[in-house]
Design a protein with these regions (language model features):
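Transmembrane-helix signature of polytopic, membrane-embedded enzymes
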Residues: 100-123, 140-141, 159, 166
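Short acidic/glycine- and proline-prone juxtamembrane loop motifs at membrane-interface regions
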Residues: 128-139
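Hydrophobic, aromatic-rich transmembrane alpha-helices
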Residues: 267-300
């Protein structure tokens, strides 16, 4: 593509990304800041890092430092909401859609390629698996880029050495980027790299391929390695991010999660089957691309066979693009004249349909529950009386301290799924040491914890209950505990829908 066409394509991808995320992202201006869970944890980690706390020492979770850096930059853009992350997400999705277009152009003319890209978000934002912004949203671009590189190699294995080197370096960068976001996704991308390496033997490019992959991976990882060696604790980083994260899926709590999500897992598995069948359609009469089927199965295995949360299936969605290439390409070959004329209108109609269909996952998109909002901001008002309050959660973080610059009280301030006994004991030790200004107890704890027992332990350390925060159809969800003496908001305290949409700084912090 010429520079002019490239810039025009990037601009269209950016506009489409903005529109998609404005209506479908939980971080959008249309959404309030309550109702976040995974993204609330990531935001807390990024915020803690930007405030001088040491990753994996002062705070920890099962995700990588690149994801926390993304959320830390989002925090710097806006301290008290997720709209900073929203704008960063637009950049990531712009790149994802642009790379998807480039991949389509390997097989299709510009107009059918554009229609494929317009349809693709139907899968990327599929409402049954995409309920909030998660780490997979930021992995999409690297998966798509690695798929593009492998497809180039599958299409023409006799590429010049410089092209082999360039594609290999990019795949290495993608590997390390995903390793630093969520390490099991790096294993999935490793399957694409393995196929590329195997194919490099035929044109005798294996040394160029291997060297490029190693160089790309090293360049991406080096800044983080140096940071942890010089300014943090590299050993603790390895222990927490790789070893402890692996161990969290080995225990009775994992069985509890499997039973809890079993029905959803069965429902979501049909998505994997649909994407697989679509890949078969693409590979029909294109058997040189059958290696993609092998990679698809490695991706599915990498998600976990015993337990796969619904958003894990997002990792498979980039493969759906190959089905679109096959079907859209066939339709354009049959009716080229009419389809080329209708492409702009079809792209607009498809975009509207994608947003309408996938908005099912966004509950209370334009107007959230008034009662939920009142409870959420009442809790935030109480916490705002402490400068940068330190929080501890019994169960998963839910973003209640986001509007008041709250920070983690300890390394395991929120409970990871499958938390080990050592993690739980350290949290109890921190509770006894009075590290937290506020403790939030969920009424939906894991099977090894009873609400009454947990609240008794919290109260024994001098904390008193302030209020129950309702969420999800006005059900009591969280109990806020704090030290005695904090004030409730005055009667005229109110957070309006306009405050939410304009992302006003409610507490003037």
């Amino acid at each position: 593509m010429t520079t002019h066409k490239t810039l025009r394509t990037l601009l269209l991808c950016a506009i489409y990304s903005f529109v998609l995320l404005f209506f479908l992202s939980s971080d959008s201006y249309l959404r309030d800041i309550f109702g976040h869970f995974d993204s609330a944890i990531f935001f807390m980690c990024g915020k803690a890092w930007m405030n001088g706390l040491t990753p994996y020492v002062d705070f920890s979770d099962s995700k990588g430092p690149l994801l926390w850096l993304i959320y830390g930059l989002g925090y710097l853009l806006n301290h008290h909401s997720y709209v900073g992350v929203f704008w960063i997400s637009i950049l990531f999705y712009t790149a994802t859609l642009f790379i998807a277009y480039k991949l389509c152009r390997l097989f299709l003319e510009p107009r059918p390629a554009a229609l494929c890209v317009a349809i693709l978000p139907l899968a990327l934002f599929y409402y049954e698996i995409h309920c909030e912004v998660v780490s997979e949203d930021f992995s999409y671009v690297f998966i798509m880029l690695a798929l593009y590189c492998l497809t180039r190699i599958l299409r023409d294995r006799d590429l010049p050495a410089n092209t082999w080197r360039r594609l290999s370096v990019v795949m290495g960068v993608c590997f390390s980027a995903c390793l630093l976001i969520k390490w099991n996704v790096a294993g999935m991308i490793g399957s694409l790299m393995l196929v590329a390496f195997i194919l490099s033997f035929q044109p005798k490019r294996w040394a160029v391929c291997l060297g490029g992959m190693v160089a790309g991976a090293a360049v991406m990882a080096l800044p983080f390695v140096l940071y942890f060696l010089l300014f943090a604790d590299f050993g603790t980083f390895i222990q927490e991010y790789f070893i402890n994260t692996y161990r969290t899926m080995d225990g009775k709590e994992s069985a509890f999660v499997v039973l809890t999500w079993g029905r959803l897992m069965f429902i979501k598995e049909r998505l994997a089957i649909i994407v697989f069948l679509g890949l078969l359609v693409f590979c029909y009469k294109r058997w040189r691309y059958a290696w993609l089927i092998f990679c698809f199965f490695i991706f599915r295995i990498g998600m976990g066979l015993a337990y796969s949360s619904k958003h894990y299936y997002m990792n498979l969605m980039p493969f759906f693009l190959f089905f679109l290439i096959a079907v859209v390409g066939y339709i354009y070959s049959k009716w080229p004249r009419w389809m080329n004329r209708l492409t702009p209108a079809l792209c607009i109609l498809v975009a509207i349909g994608v947003i309408y269909y996938n908005s099912k996952s966004i509950n209370g998109h334009f107007r959230g529950s008034e009662q939920d909002r009142e409870d959420f901001y009442t809790a935030a008002y109480i916490m705002s009386q402490v400068e940068q309050p330190r929080l501890m959660w019994y169960n998963m973080e839910a973003g209640m301290g986001t509007p008041v610059d709250a920070l983690p009280a300890c390394r395991y301030w929120t409970r990871q799924i499958g938390a080990s006994e050592e993690m739980l004991k350290e949290r109890e030790k921190m509770l006894a040491g009075g590290k937290a200004d506020f403790v939030i107890v969920s009424r939906h704890l894991h099977e090894d914890e009873v609400v009454e027992e947990v609240t008794a332990r919290v109260e024994a350390q001098g904390y008193v209950p302030y209020l129950e925060v309702r969420a999800f159809a006005n059900e009591p969800k969280f109990i806020l505990f704090g030290r005695p003496g904090w004030q409730f908001p005055p009667e005229d305290f109110h957070v309006s829908q306009w405050d939410v949409w304009l992302k006003r700084n409610i507490f003037g912090i």
